[in-house]
C-alpha cells in the first residue's frame, strides 16, 4: 500500500515536472516568437522607409526632368508664337504694299488724263454758247475724276516757294532769280501727287539758281523741255 502510494507520488511529481517543463518551453517559445515578430516588424519598417526614400528620390528626379521639359516646351512655344506673329505682320505688310502698288499703278495711268483736262480748262476759251456748254460738260467730268482721286487718298503737292527735295521733286529747269534763293522752287511745270503719304508722282519743277547766277540751260534747251512736258499744267486743288 505504501509502495503504491509512493508510486503515485512519483507519478504526480513526474506529471508536475512535465507540466512545468511544458510551461517553460511554451514560455520560451512565446518569448522567441515575440522577439522574432519584433525583429520582423523592425525589418519591415526599415524596408518601407528605404522604399519610401527611393520613391521620393525618384519622384524628385522625375519632377526636375518634367520642369526642364516644361521650360523647353515653353521656350519653344514663345519662339513659335513670336515667329507666327512676325509672319502675320509681314503678310499683312506685304498685302498692304501690294495693294498700294496696284492702286498706284492704276492711278498713275489716270493722272495724264487729269493733266489734259486741266490744260484744256486753262487754254480753251469758249465763246459761243454751244462751246461753253461743251466746256462745262467735260469740266464736270474732270471734277468728278478729281473727287474720285481724293476719295482714293490722292492729294496734290504744293511746291512753289518750297525747298527743292529730290525725294519729291524732279528739277527740269534751273534759272537765276532775284526773288528766290538758290534751290527754291520757282515754278511748277507738272503737278506731283501723294498717295496716303507716299509719292505717287514726282513734281516737275523749275528751280532757282539764286540771284546773279548764270542759267545753265540755253534757251533752245529750255524750249525743248517745255515742249516735252507738252505745256501741261497741273490739276487745281478745287473741285
Swiss-Prot record:
Residues 1-39, 207-239 are annotated as: Disordered. Homodimer. Its main location: cytoplasm. The gene is grpE. Keywords: Chaperone, Cytoplasm, Stress response. The keyword Ribosomal protein does not apply. CDD domains: GrpE. This is Protein GrpE. GO terms for biological process: protein folding. Participates actively in the response to hyperosmotic and heat shock by preventing the aggregation of stress-denatured proteins, in association with DnaK and GrpE. It is the nucleotide exchange factor for DnaK and may function as a thermosensor. Unfolded proteins bind initially to DnaJ; upon interaction with the DnaJ-bound protein, DnaK hydrolyzes its bound ATP, resulting in the formation of a stable complex. GrpE releases ADP from DnaK; ATP binding to DnaK triggers the release of the substrate protein, thus completing the reaction cycle.
